[in-house]
Regions:
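Beta1/beta-strand and adjacent pyrophosphate-binding region of the FAD-binding site
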Residues: 2-15
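Core beta-strand elements of the Rossmann-like FAD/NAD(P) dinucleotide-binding domain
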Residues: 3-5, 150-159
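Residue-level detector of alpha-helix initiation sites
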Residues: 13-14, 39, 43, 165
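Glycine-rich FAD pyrophosphate-binding loop
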Residues: 24-44
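Active-site-adjacent segment of FAD-dependent monooxygenases/related oxidoreductases
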Residues: 44, 49-117, 136
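Conserved FAD-binding catalytic core of PHBH/FMO-like flavoproteins
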Residues: 116, 152, 159, 163-217
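A conserved short coil-to-beta-strand element within the FAD-binding core of flavoproteins
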Residues: 128-142
């Protein structure tokens, strides 16, 4: 295919990587760029739901993800005063999905799995330390302006997928709004090996625990 039939993807997070693999498996050439020198590891989310797992199965990466994560067939909302408020058994979805459970796994592990697959493919170009700065479009396709270690560069493609995060340069330069709000409270996200099951009766593998004073989950 000519270069202008290539799909450009900005951002090598879970969305960008998954889109790249989906397109490449269907014979569509892809250029995936990432502003960082390596794949980001500060991705906050860690839950993969049944529809996402079905999609990842179609992409051929579900087995690797299962090896990296924890299978959770149920999850809870809890209150420190009342105990279990609600319990969800994902097994009820067994006739609607091939994966009636959630997988708890850091998102960066998925991006590593997918990029390893992309690097085996001839129609994919994965480039790091490439930062999007702007974009334009004409009847022939799209131009993505980027900064590289060697200086400014233009990438040409038929389409552009913006997966460059909450502060997306591409979205901003296109004037696309991202309405929302910011909570005034400060939040701390941490990983721990603390044995919560020793302190909460009937604790599910995933539990969101609310407290009226400390607000923890």
């Amino acid at each position: 295919m000519p270069v202008n039939d290539r799909v450009l993807i900005a951002g090598a997070g879970p969305v960008g990587c998954s889109a790249a693999l989906y397109l490449a498996q269907r014979g569509i050439p892809v250029t995936l760029i990432e502003a960082g020198a390596v794949l980001p590891e500060d991705l906050r989310a860690s839950t993969f739901h049944p529809p996402t797992l079905d999609m990842l199965d179609e992409l051929g990466v579900i087995d690797q993800l299962l090896e990296e994560g924890i299978v959770c067939p149920e999850w809870q909302y809890r209150d420190t005063r009342e105990g279990v408020v609600a319990n969800w058994d994902l097994g009820v979805l067994k006739n609607d999905t091939s994966h009636p459970y959630r997988i708890q796994c850091e998102q960066y592990k998925l991006t590593r799995i997918i990029v390893a697959e992309l690097e085996k493919m001839d129609n994919v170009d994965v480039r790091f330390r490439i930062r999007a700065t702007g974009t334009s479009q004409d009847k022939h396709g799209v131009t993505l302006n980027v900064d590289t270690p060697e200086g400014p560069e233009e990438l040409k493609g038929r389409y552009l997928i913006a997966a460059d995060g909450a502060s997306s340069v591409i979205r901003i330069t296109q004037g696309i709004e991202f309405p929302g709000l910011t909570f005034p409270e400060l939040w701390l996200c941490t990983s721990t090996e603390f044995k919560f099951e020793d302190h909460f009766e009937d604790l599910a593998p995933i539990a969101y625990i609310a407290d009226p004073d400390f607000w923890f989950v």
